[in-house]
């Protein structure tokens, strides 16, 4: 628990005791006291509507109740500088800023751990994201999903959740058969032999490369073998080739997974039919027109869903149900699936399946990643300059840089369409959001280096009471909000709140820097205090950027 949280608890307790004294309520009957941070700091550091909550019980107007509470609040509390009543009965608090200086040694001590909390209480979450078919390059939607999924996992972990990251490899569908047939055709081609290319095959340069690899590895060994034997071998190689590419691209994007789960394993380990039988035992399966159906309309889906078609083949829905059952049986309390925009209509049926399996529908959350449109100099970009094809994640990283790509994708709520301004992302000006935040970190690093060259080291023992200016206090207030912002971003599944916070922190630092001289050799005690202060800002900027998978440069 940080200093800000401790003081909120103290303030809430003080308000509760003031209510007991002023209104005459027993402590157990005092309603939950909520503190809000006013949008305009002119209205105080905190505000509460407790007087309005008490109006019915006290049978008085809220403002009259507030007037009776305020004198009690002013008694014997060093934390409160001033209290005022606003509007119909809001009570606004102005705190004594001296408490803020207690943050500095705390942040310096916690360092990389600053921002951590036990908000999540160790609840086990699994976040499954990206999960692109292993048949080609990652596109912009995958990139946005990767950035948001990884950032969310980082944020939730810092907020005290037990988080596992998973990639579901769709390696059992027709697309894999087409991949194998494409690799086979390119294998024959690499050997100088004629081969008919599959109608729905994959024609990318990577498949040509795969065919050459197969020819180099096996020579003509599989030219005259049976199709079954050849394709069985090539399937393993093709999947290893494609998933290897995906892993490499994601690792470069600073995204890693705890588990790469193969769809094929569901069949190999006999996980699909037991899931079907569980649904049947629970009474939600019926047969009609030669097909097997799941009665999802019992759970507010708009129609029932086919699991096994009349020809005996499975729909995609059945192995998906088996996969989600497998995840829940692994002991996760909540599953978070991050899906593309084209999967929005899939949510009701999957929630229905979770409930039909006997679990709470609240154990499945789905975050939808909306579409990304690229713009450069105000013109929409649809094709890569390098390849003449659709822009891939790798293309975008090469064009604007890894940090800008990660940061920009985290800037907006995942369920909103995104116009990605490539010109802005490449800009080295304060108009570029990631540059603005990174520059604050680099500037602090530069000041700290200059201080060190003059024999000044950051210390926890500096006299922080010497921090007296409004800009110093404003910076401290923003610094103190970090753990709460992380917890809120985790609770709301909203990485963009970290982006917003980092912008606010960078702004607070720049204002402080523009109005206060940090290195003043004629006033070493104040200099020492300010060095410690900016070090805490550096730590917090770095920790926030790290949550987003963005670097915190020492120089720019």
From Swiss-Prot:
Record-annotated membrane-spanning stretches: none
Superkingdom of the organism of origin: Bacteria
Chief location bin: cytoplasm
E.C. no: 6.1.1.19
Catalytic function, reaction form: tRNA(Arg) + L-arginine + ATP = L-arginyl-tRNA(Arg) + AMP + diphosphate
Quaternary structure note: Monomer.
Cross-referenced HAMAP family: Arg_tRNA_synth
Name listed for the protein in its UniProt record: Arginine--tRNA ligase
GN (gene name): argS
């Amino acid at each position: 628990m940080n200093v800000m949280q401790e003081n909120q608890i103290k303030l809430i307790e003080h308000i509760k005791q003031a209510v007991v004294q002023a209104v005459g309520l027993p402590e157990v009957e005092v309603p939950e006291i909520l503190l809000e941070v006013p949008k305009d700091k002119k209205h105080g550091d905190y505000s509460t509507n407790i007087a309005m909550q008490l109006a019915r019980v006290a049978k008085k107007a809220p403002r009259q109740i507030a007037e009776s509470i305020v004198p009690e609040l002013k008694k014997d509390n060093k934390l409160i500088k001033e209290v005022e009543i606003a509007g119909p009965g809001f009570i606004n608090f102005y705190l004594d800023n001296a408490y803020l200086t207690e943050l500095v040694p705390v942040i310096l001590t916690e360092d990389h751990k600053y921002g951590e909390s036990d908000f999540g209480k160790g609840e086990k979450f699994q976040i499954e994201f990206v999960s692109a078919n292993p048949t080609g390059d990652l596109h912009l939607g995958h990139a946005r999903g990767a950035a948001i999924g990884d950032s969310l996992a980082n944020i939730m972990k810092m907020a005290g959740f037990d988080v596992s990251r998973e990639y579901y490899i769709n390696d059992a569908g027709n697309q894999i058969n087409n991949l194998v047939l494409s690799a086979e055709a390119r294998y024959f081609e690499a050997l100088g032999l004629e081969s008919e290319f599959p109608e729905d095959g994959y024609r990318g340069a990577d498949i040509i490369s795969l065919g050459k690899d197969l020819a180099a590895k096996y020579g003509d060994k599989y030219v005259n073998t049976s199709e079954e034997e050849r394709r069985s071998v090539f399937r393993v190689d093709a999947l290893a080739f494609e998933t290897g590419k995906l892993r490499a691209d994601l690792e470069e994007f600073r995204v890693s997974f705890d588990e790469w789960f193969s769809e094929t394993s569901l069949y190999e380990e006999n996980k699909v039919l037991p899931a079907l039988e569980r649904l049947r035992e629970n009474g939600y399966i019926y047969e009609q027109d030669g097909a097997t159906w799941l009665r999802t309309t019992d759970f507010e889906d708009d129609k029932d869903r086919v699991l096994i078609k009349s020809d005996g083949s499975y729909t995609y829905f059945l192995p998906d149900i088996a996969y989600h059952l497998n995840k829940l049986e692994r002991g996760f309390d909540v599953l978070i699936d991050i899906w593309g925009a084209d999967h929005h209509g899939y949510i009701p049926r999957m929630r229905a399946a979770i409930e039909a399996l006997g679990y709470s529908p609240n154990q499945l959350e789905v975050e939808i990643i909306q579409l990304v449109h690229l713009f450069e100099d105000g013109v929409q970009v649809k094709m890569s300059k390098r390849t003449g094809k659709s822009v891939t994640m790798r293309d975008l990283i090469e064009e604007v840089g890894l940090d800008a790509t990660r940061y920009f994708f985290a800037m907006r709520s995942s369920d909103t369409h995104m116009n990605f301004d490539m010109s802005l992302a490449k800009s080295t000006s304060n108009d570029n959001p990631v540059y603005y935040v990174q520059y604050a970190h680099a500037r602090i690093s530069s000041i700290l280096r200059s201080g060190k060259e003059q024999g000044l080291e950051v210390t926890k023992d500096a006299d922080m009471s010497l921090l007296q200016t409004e800009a110093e206090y404003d910076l401290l207030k923003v610094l103190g909000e970090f753990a709460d912002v992380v917890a809120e971003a985790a609770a709301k599944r909203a990485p963009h709140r970290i982006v917003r916070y980092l912008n606010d922190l960078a702004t607070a630092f720049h204002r402080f820097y523009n109005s206060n001289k940090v290195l003043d050799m004629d006033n070493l005690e104040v200099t020492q205090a300010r060095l410690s202060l900016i070090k805490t800002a550096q730590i917090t900027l770095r920790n926030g950027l790290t949550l987003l998978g963005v670097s915190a440069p020492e120089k720019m």
